[in-house]
Amino acid sequence: MRNMVNKDQVAGLAKQLKGSVKQAAGKATGNRRTQAEGMADKVAGKVQKAYGDVKDKVKKAF
């Protein structure tokens, strides 16, 4: 069986990456708001990826 990645997993990873970059930029410039937005994006990405992981496991179970 092939190991396929669904769109929620990919989008979640992309949000995590975007959040990491935004958080680092905020930290480097001393902009706490940007840093906090980056942290929020990372959390949202983790949640979306976890949702994609669950969808994938359910799909494989059936």
Curated annotation (Swiss-Prot):
Listed SUPFAM superfamilies: Hypothetical protein YjbJ (SSF69047)
Superkingdom to which the source organism belongs: Bacteria
Start and end residues of each stretch annotated as Disordered: 1-42
Pfam families: CsbD
InterPro entries with a match to the protein in the record: CsbD, UPF0337_stress_rsp, YjbJ_sf
Recorded family membership: Belongs to the UPF0337 (CsbD) family.
PANTHER family, sorted: UPF0337 PROTEIN YJBJ
Official protein name in the record: UPF0337 protein mll8179
Lineage of the species this protein comes from: Bacteria, Pseudomonadati, Pseudomonadota, Alphaproteobacteria, Hyphomicrobiales
